[in-house]
Amino acid sequence: MDIEIGFHEENWAQVEAAWTAWWAGELERPLVMVEDLERLPGVSMGSIYEMGAPVCSFPLDTPADQLLDYYQVRLEARRSYGDAWPKWWPNLGPGIMAGFLSADLHTAEDTVWFEPVEQMPIQDLQPAFDAENAWWQRTLEVTRLAVERWGDQVSVAHTDLGGNLDILASLLTTERLLFDLHDHPEEVARLAGRLTQLWLRYYDELYCLVELAGRGTTPWAAIWSPARCYMLQSDFAYMISPRMFERFVLPDIATCCAALDHAFYHLDGKGQIPHLDMLLSLERLRGIQWI
């Protein structure tokens, strides 16, 4: 289906050339991304809904084509200049992988969060891939249909899978995970490693869909790659020591970096600065987003 976004093959060629050169360290200027959004009826400028409410805020029985109609209006109201490009991010909330693993998903006007379905000892927690999980099926459906509908006109992003301890906090609660780091560190290490392996599976299955458009990859953040990229993160790491970061988070980041061509890290808050030297030691981590 054609989409009127004012972005043509020559624009794509320029974006791909600039970003490819930037990753190679050969671009002799900074990347500059400019986006212009036309005013939409009933949507204030600067609203979180400029690009639409999260996918997860709609009932699960809402037809996917109807959802994409809603997002297409917003895509067609946006223009990309410089090194920016047309993208659509299937937003199901930060760390939706917790939802894939059966955490309860809650939405409010301006946020999404997760809670465990039931409280259980950390020793009993056994996260496993569930191909029939409703949120996983929804993510696959909207990603696949977006690629089929917009083809090579729009870069369809990976959803925000989350970081291993962020996901674990959603399955246990943040408070319980903080206690378990002290009381049951071996169990935390077991689950952190298991979640990393599940993360890689979810990433790969989504990559098999988005690569069909032939427009590289992009995560929830404004980075583009001709190959496999992602904005890795561990917001939970703000609350833990460098020693704990080295044991429970760094192996996850290193493993994910090894599976990606262009990995970035989302350094969210000054509480993560104590971990910076360890992050910089990862040869395959290509950059850090300083928030």
What are these regions (language model features)?
Residues M1-S44, G52, S57, Y70, ...:
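Active-site loop segments of alpha/beta catalytic cores
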Residues K87-Q123:
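A contiguous, low-structure linker/loop signature
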